């Protein structure tokens, strides 16, 4: 088997840095979890785009007469939260679906609940916090309508992000509880060290893949094309 080479993030060749992670949905994730994993990845991408749009909104805020603090914080949130959200909550759920690890699920729940709270705060938009939320945007309409309209775009995106985050958290929690997962299982993985044992992880991944393939290849009940009836000659 060829060695897996890190391929994410896909950096341009002129940047003297190399990718930090290996990511291949089709190769790593069992088919029954593929759709959910990709949706969470798209949610991470939406979060990153929202932070970038928020930077533009805060620039319009600054040009319209707002303080420079919001623009500076918006830039900080972009360069800080984009990689941190990938490492802190997407990689754990990627690993959880890949290896069926209860510890990784718990790590995801813990960090993603923080992500949900942050998204709600961003949507609210407290002035001076570097986010174009509802309070900051609505209050700025009386100062500069043009800037406020631009600020409205990241405000809507923050709101969408908060709603989608709540839905995603509910769906993953429902799946985890339905599959028999629990906090005690995560504690057991932590105690035994199974969460960081590559052999255990590979065995769990192979078992998940095998279960998925078995479900898809399950033989169907065969029926005879021509029915065979036996009649009695006795009257």
Curated annotation (Swiss-Prot):
GO cellular component: Golgi membrane; plasma membrane; recycling endosome membrane; synaptic vesicle membrane; trans-Golgi network membrane
Chief localisation class: membrane
Membrane topology term: Multi-pass membrane protein
GO terms (BP aspect): exocytosis; positive regulation of calcium ion-dependent exocytosis; positive regulation of cytokine production; protein transport
Keywords, comma-separated and alphabetical: Cell membrane, Cytoplasmic vesicle, Endosome, Exocytosis, Golgi apparatus, Membrane, Protein transport, Synapse, Transmembrane, Transmembrane helix, Transport
UniProt KW Transport keyword: yes
Location relative to the cell: Cell membrane; Golgi apparatus membrane; Golgi apparatus, trans-Golgi network membrane; Recycling endosome membrane
InterPro entries: SCAMP (IPR007273)
Chain ranges passing through the membrane: 40-60, 68-88, 103-125, 149-169
Residue numbers on the Cytoplasmic membrane side: 1-39, 89-102, 170-235
Ranges of the Extracellular topological domain: 61-67, 126-148
Function: Required for the calcium-dependent exocytosis of signal sequence-containing cytokines such as CCL5. Probably acts in cooperation with the SNARE machinery.
Family: Belongs to the SCAMP family. SCAMP5 subfamily.
Subunit-structure text: Interacts (via C-terminal part) with SYT1 and SYT2; interaction with synaptotagmins making a link with the SNARE molecules. Interacts with SLC9A7.
Name of the protein in its database record: Secretory carrier-associated membrane protein 5
Organism from which the protein derives: Bos taurus
The encoding gene: SCAMP5
């Amino acid at each position: 088997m060829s060695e897996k080479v890190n391929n994410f993030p896909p950096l341009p060749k002129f940047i003297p840095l190399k990718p930090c992670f290996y990511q291949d949905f089709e190769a790593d994730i069992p088919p029954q979890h593929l759709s959910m994993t990709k949706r969470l990845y798209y949610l991470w991408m939406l979060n990153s785009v929202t932070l970038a749009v928020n930077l533009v909104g805060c620039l319009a805020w600054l040009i319209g007469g707002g303080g420079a603090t919001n623009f500076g914080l918006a830039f900080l949130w972009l360069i800080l939260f984009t990689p941190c959200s990938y490492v802190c909550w997407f990689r754990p759920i990627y690993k959880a679906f890949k290896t069926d690890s209860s510890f990784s699920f718990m790590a995801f729940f813990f960090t993603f609940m923080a992500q949900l709270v942050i998204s709600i705060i961003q949507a609210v938009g407290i002035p001076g916090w570097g986010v174009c939320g509802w309070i900051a945007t609505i209050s700025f309409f009386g100062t500069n309508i043009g800037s406020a309209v631009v600020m409205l775009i990241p405000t809507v995106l923050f709101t969408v992000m908060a709603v989608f985050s709540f839905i995603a958290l509910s769906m993953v929690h429902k799946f985890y509880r339905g599959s028999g997962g629990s906090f005690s299982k995560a504690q057991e993985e932590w105690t035994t060290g199974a969460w960081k044992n590559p052999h255990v992880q590979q065995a769990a991944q192979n078992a998940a893949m095998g279960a998925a393939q078995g479900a898809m290849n399950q033989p169907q009940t065969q029926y005879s094309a021509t029915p065979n009836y036996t009649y009695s000659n006795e009257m």
